[in-house]
């Protein structure tokens, strides 16, 4: 999560 619109690992910023 974080800057990603779906749950999972925040690999993309």
Swiss-Prot record:
Modified residues (Pyrrolidone carboxylic acid): 1
Role: This peptide both inhibits the activity of the angiotensin-converting enzyme (ACE) and enhances the action of bradykinin by inhibiting the peptidases that inactivate it. It acts as an indirect hypotensive agent.
Gene Ontology molecular-function annotations: peptidase inhibitor activity; toxin activity
Family statement drawn from the similarity comment of this UniProt entry: Belongs to the bradykinin-potentiating peptide family.
GO biological process: regulation of blood pressure
Tissues showing expression: Expressed by the venom gland.
Protein name: Bradykinin-potentiating peptide 13a
